[in-house]
Amino acid sequence: MATKAVCVLKGDNSPVKGIINFEQKERNGPVKVWGSIEGLTEGLHGFHVHEFGDNTVGCTSAGPHFNPLSRKHGGPKDEERHVGDLGNVTADKDGVASVSIEDSVISLSGDHCIIGRTLVVHEKADDLGKGGNEESTKTGNAGSRLACGVIGIAQ
């Protein structure tokens, strides 16, 4: 039986909002991630699962990227990456990003479970850990947190 989750993204003092869905058809199988985010500037925006499902002080309460394996930041296809590193979403000229990702590192159960954690869309492009400085190995230089939401169990 498939496991499903959903995240409603809301702007942290920004007009950014969206709905992102997650589905994992088998326990150790890939997770499909899809949905739409609006209110963005045109171009790439970092897209990560952060450690905590805490938005009490806005998106900053979510903590760092979800990284249970204590690795350096990377891209979604890299061996060396945080579990929560989902790369970038691309917004069109109207500020809308259509999201369609399949990821085999995140999970909806077990040690890499993202349910109850916060999904964040960032101000800038994620350099995927290749920016040549220390911040790149932690955050991908993706900048401030534009919008976030806690990932919850869905029907």
From Swiss-Prot:
**PROSITE patterns to which the protein is assigned, alphabetical:** SOD_CU_ZN_1 (PS00087), SOD_CU_ZN_2 (PS00332)
For biological process, the GO terms are: auditory receptor cell stereocilium organization; embryo implantation; glutathione metabolic process; heart contraction; hydrogen peroxide biosynthetic process; intracellular iron ion homeostasis; locomotory behavior; muscle cell cellular homeostasis
Q: Where is the lipid attached (S-palmitoyl cysteine)?
A: C7
Tell me the name of the encoding gene: SOD1
Q: What is this protein called?
A: Superoxide dismutase [Cu-Zn]
Query: What the entry says about post-translational processing?
Result: Palmitoylation helps nuclear targeting and decreases catalytic activity. Succinylation, adjacent to copper catalytic site, probably inhibits activity. Desuccinylation by SIRT5 enhances activity.
Assembly information from the UniProt record: Homodimer; non-disulfide-linked. Heterodimer with SOD1. The heterodimer CCS:SOD1 interacts with SLC31A1; this heterotrimer is Cu(1+)-mediated and its maintenance is regulated through SOD1 activation.
Q: What is its main location?
A: cytoplasm
For this UniProt record, the keywords arranged alphabetically read as follows:
Acetylation, Antioxidant, Copper, Cytoplasm, Disulfide bond, Lipoprotein, Metal-binding, Nucleus, Oxidoreductase, Palmitate, Phosphoprotein, Zinc
**Listed EC numbers:** 1.15.1.1
Q: List the disulfide bonds.
A: C59-C148
